[in-house]
Each structure stands twice: as structure tokens, then as C-alpha cells.
Amino acid sequence: MNSLFASTARGLEELLKTELESLGARECQVVQGGVHFEGDTRLIYQSLMWSRLASRIMLPLGACKVYSDLDLYLGVQATDWTEIFAPGATFAVHFSGLNDEIRNSQYGALKVKDAIVDSFTRKNLERPNVDRENPDLRINVWLNKETAHISLDLCGEGLHQRGYRDRAGIAPIKENLAAAIVMRSGWQPGTPLLDPMCGSGTLLIEAAMMATDRAPGLHRGQWGFNGWAQHDDAIWKEVKAEAQVRARKGLADYGSRFYGSDSDARVIERAASNARRAGIGELISFEVKDVAQLTNPLPKGPYGTVISNPPYGERLDSEPALIALHSLLGRSMKDYFGGWNLSLFSGSPELLSCLQLRAERQFKAKNGPLDCVQKNYHLTEKEGDSKPSTVAEDYANRLRKNLKKFEKWAKQEGIECYRLYDADLPEYNVAVDRYADWIVVQEYAAPKTIDAQKARQRLLDIIAATIGVLGIAPNKLVLKTRERQKGTNQYQKMSDKGDFIEVGEYNARLWVNLTDYLDTGLFLDHRIARRMLGQMSKGKDFLNLFAYTGSASVHAGLGGARSTTTMDMSRTYLEWAERNLRLNGLTGRQHRLLQADVLGWLRDTDEQFDLIFIDPPTFSNSKRMEDTFDVQRDHIRLMSDLKRLLRKGGTIMFSNNKRGFRMDNDGLAALGLKAQEISQKTLSQDFARNRQIHNCWLITAV
């Protein structure tokens, strides 16, 4: 009787124990990451051939205390390696674990190798050769604290490598994990099984192999016992022959079918090729189909199971796309699969909640380093005929109402960028902006008192509802998180995609970038102010300070300004402004772009202008500015500098975003200036719900 150890993925240990017992294993003991068991030589081969869940099966050879590298060397030599190595067998050492004495796994492997080789040379026997790539024997040493556990790896390559998969699709799951998912799904062999996002087909192939009694080890060409001195080839051939007979009979007797689909034609080709290599290709129908096209292949029955490992962040980099995918899958299940079961394996329980289905059972497991969950659902027959439930229904209804109102208005105004929703409902605390055929959802950061998990779930619901109501492609939705900005944080770069899209605003064409920065390059709430500047600028010299991307300069130029001067401290935004001007045909020396500290430039310049637009930050302590700036504290000093630049009869349009800003009218009067507040006049319909979003004034000489 041999003492053995079978390793497996975390979370599958009990399932593996049951499987090993069904094969005849004795004295099974579950530990984290595997099962200790006992069995004779036939059971060794049976477990290697038939275990669908084990990652590796090890034959423990001994253990030793390791307080020095010499202890490791002598402990390895305590094993009689001549009883392990067949003549001429090559080997490799896999060493894992460290302690205070063995601090490098390569060094540990080297000491083990030396000990094994020296045990042969000391007996005047031919020393075995090392073959790291394709060894006959794999010696496994695991150092746990002060104890080294020495084993013979009987598998060679991991048991998940069944031999049927050539090239996997994106982010595949291992075959033994796939087998566990099938076992836990509730699916019964003889009933239909469908995977609508099958990738390389692993779930379906593993299920078909189970259903047809095909051993998972039948297609493997190499094993870790080939160079084992105690290998019994006769027993192994018996085990293999029995597996071949059972596979042929199982395939001939099986009458049900499997269905797989995926949106990628190349992946489907690989899946079909994998199934053929596994010997069950004739049982699986593969087709290229998106989840949006998913229907029941057996609408008149019988009932079956839908199983899948949908993408959950490791396979797609767009969260809105994942949310839309899961929402769509949930609706398809309700629409077409009443009476069926559904089982999904995912690394994101939040995404599974987008299905809007209640799970009956769930299991936990690891997919590599990822904590994952498998949830099983039953779709009642009435659900298959019912209208899918609406995600975030109150929010969806409000967004639908706003869309009807603003879409028509925006078309009449000649604008392609506008706000559709601005935290209208307190529990759905986001802003939703349209930029042509793109949507930007800005999440206002939740207070620390709000549970982070609940806030994330609410956001997922919002994104799903937004995509559903607006009918946009998921890749046309951009998600941002907005917090209170300090200084120039709103200008910090968030991405390097560099994707610009062209949008229309009245008679202007402008470039916006929806992904690389917190803001997009166009402040939508200043839309009317920009139009006013265009109407006021004919024949005038126009100065645009803290100009950002120069959209106000574009409107002034299109309005017939004699010249435009666009100033900002950022070279990036000035280059953006230059692109905006050029897009509208505003080129030439009369359209200047200046990179400068605005406040310092104002104090030093003696230039004169007829129309000045200034939209300073609420507060700034930029290293590139000479001192700090606070718009409430410093606006009169700012007006004093601006007055020097203002020609007789000229106008300053002064705007800021400080809530509760108070204009110092007495201070203005002392400068010989007066102010007319136009804050409400510059708010368009889409911002009427937020009357404090900006302050705006026209300032002229008395």
C-alpha cells in the first residue's frame, strides 16, 4: 500500500476526496490544497487516468529537518534513489518554499540535485542526467518552515493538461477547475448543456468527457512514472485498455448534445478543434454568436443547463461592457430559457448581480490567485415568458424622461454635447453627459459613511440601466469618478489612450477627449457663455485667460474677432486649443497662443483688449505660479490688473465655480468698475437643476 497526495485548486478539496474514494482510495484526509490517501499500484494508475479534479498526484518519499544546506543534502540522500530511478532515467527538481537557511529556491534545487547525483556516484553507479525540459522523473521538494517534504511527481506535466487543448482562447480556466464547475453546476448527463461564451470550449469538452465515460488521462502522451523503477507497465496497460473500451462504449451510447457559442470566430475554430482532439467533437455544436443573439436551441424541450465562465475583468478591460454583457445575459435567460438551470463561475459577484436573478446555491473556489464564486440558478417556466425586470428602475425612468426632453432641445439648438442627468435622484448620485454618440458617466464619490460594496453595486446598476435606456454600445460609455478637486487636480492625466472625437457646439467644431483626463476638454455648463462671447466679439481683440482648451477663443474667432489671444500655463492644453482653432479655420498670426503664469503676466503686460474672458480656478497653489490664488480673496486684485488691459468701452466676462461666491461690489466701485450678474442667463436647460454650478458676471467701467 502506498501513501499518496493529490493536490487541487483551493476550494475543491472535498470534491476531490469524493472522487478519489469513488476510485477506491482509502484513508482519505483533506488538507488545504489537496487530499492525502492510500492505495495500491493499480489505484495509482487509476487515479492518474481518471481523476478529473487533481492537479498532481505525488508519491511521498520522505521528509527531513532543514537547519542548514547540509541538513537538506543529507536528508535527500536518506532516500535510496536507486529504487526510484529506472536505468538511464533523466530527472528535474522542482523546489518550493524558503526558510532562514535556504533563501533561494534555485539554490535549494541545486542542493537536492547534488544529493541525488552523489548518491549514485558514491555507489560507483552511472549518475543520472538532468533534463529540465522533458525529464523522465520529476522530484518535488516543498520546504515548509524547517521541514522539507520530498516526493516523486507521478504526473509529469500537471493533470489539467489533458492533451486535447492546443491553443486556448483568452484567459482560459484549467481543465480540472472546469470539471469541478461542471460537477457543481447541477447538470445531469443526458440533458442538454449550453455555454454561450464558450471560449476554447473547456467546460463543454469536460462535460462531454464525463457524460461519455471518457477518462481525462486518455489523451496524455507522457507521464511522470515512465522513469520510475517500480513502474508496473502491465497494470498500466490494463488500466489504459479499460479506459479505451469505456470511452468507445460511452460515446456510442450517448444521445444528447452540447451547444457552444462565442462572438469570436477564431476562438470557435479552436474550440471545435479541441473537441475533435478530445474524441467527442461529434457531440458538440459550435457556432459564432454574440450573447445578444442568444436563443434556446431547444425551444420545445427538453430542459437543460446553461453553464459559463463569463469575463469578469481579467478578459475585458471595459467595465461598462461587462455590466452590459451580464445584464443582457440575464434578460436572455429570462426570455428564452424558462425551466432551465443556469450556472455561472465568476471572479465578480457584483457583476453576477446584474443578471437580476436569485441564486439557489453557490460555491467558492480559486482560479489561480483569484477568489471566485460559482452561482447556480433555476429559471422558472413563467420567467421564460415574462418581461425582463428593469435594473435601477427609478433611475432608468428619470433618464428616459430626461432623454425625451433634452434630445429634441439639443437638436434644435445645434449642440451635440449636453447633460442628461445630474444626480436628480439622491440615491443615484452620478452625472450623465452625452458627447455625440458617446456617454460619460461621472460618479460623485460616495461619503465614507456609505458602504463601499453597496455604492459599487449601485454604480453597476446605473451603468447597466444607462446602456439599456440609451441603447448605446457598451464601448461607447466612459466611466469616471469625481471628487472635490484641489488646485489643478482636474488637469492630472488619467490615461494615455489619446483618443479624440470631434463634436459640434452651435457653429463651432471642437475636439474632446473622454478618457485621458477627469474633464473632457469642454465645460458644458459654459456653453451659453461661449456663445455670448462669440456674439460680442465682432471686430474686437479678444483675450482668453486660464483658457483650458481654447473653446471660448474658437467662438470668439468664429464671431468675427479681430484677434484672439489664448493663454494657459499648460502646454498640453495650448496644443489642444491650437487644434480646436485649426479645426475651425482660425489660423494665422492674429490667433496667438501663449504659455504663461496668467497672474504674473497680467501684472507685467501693457497690452490692450476689447473683450476679456477669465475663468480662474477656485484655488491654486501650482508650483509654476509665483504665489497662491483664492478667487474669493483675490478677485478684486485680479480685476484691478484686468482693468489696466481693458480698452475704453471694453467688457470683462468673469466666471468661477466657487459655491457661495460673493462679488465685492464696493471693491469694484473703488476701481471704477461695475458688475452685472448673468449666472442664471448662462445656464441652459440641461443645467437648470444645478443653479450653483458656476457664477458669471459682465464687468465694465462705470
UniProtKB/Swiss-Prot annotation:
Main location: cytoplasm
EC category name: transferase
Pfam family, one: THUMP
Reactions listed under catalytic activity: guanosine(2445) in 23S rRNA + S-adenosyl-L-methionine = N(2)-methylguanosine(2445) in 23S rRNA + S-adenosyl-L-homocysteine + H(+); guanosine(2069) in 23S rRNA + S-adenosyl-L-methionine = N(2)-methylguanosine(2069) in 23S rRNA + S-adenosyl-L-homocysteine + H(+)
GO cellular component entries: cytoplasm
Alphabetical UniProt keywords: Cytoplasm, Methyltransferase, RNA-binding, rRNA processing, S-adenosyl-L-methionine, Transferase
Sequence ranges assigned to domain THUMP in this UniProt record: 43-154
Subcellular location: Cytoplasm
EC number of this enzyme: 2.1.1.173, 2.1.1.264
Single annotated GO MF: rRNA (guanine-N7-)-methyltransferase activity
CDD domains in alphabetical order: AdoMet_MTases, THUMP_AdoMetMT
UniProt superkingdom: Bacteria
Matches recorded under NCBIfam families: PRK11783.1
Family: Belongs to the methyltransferase superfamily. RlmKL family.
HAMAP family, A to Z: 23SrRNA_methyltr_KL
Function: Specifically methylates the guanine in position 2445 (m2G2445) and the guanine in position 2069 (m7G2069) of 23S rRNA.
Protein name: Ribosomal RNA large subunit methyltransferase K/L
Primary gene name: rlmL
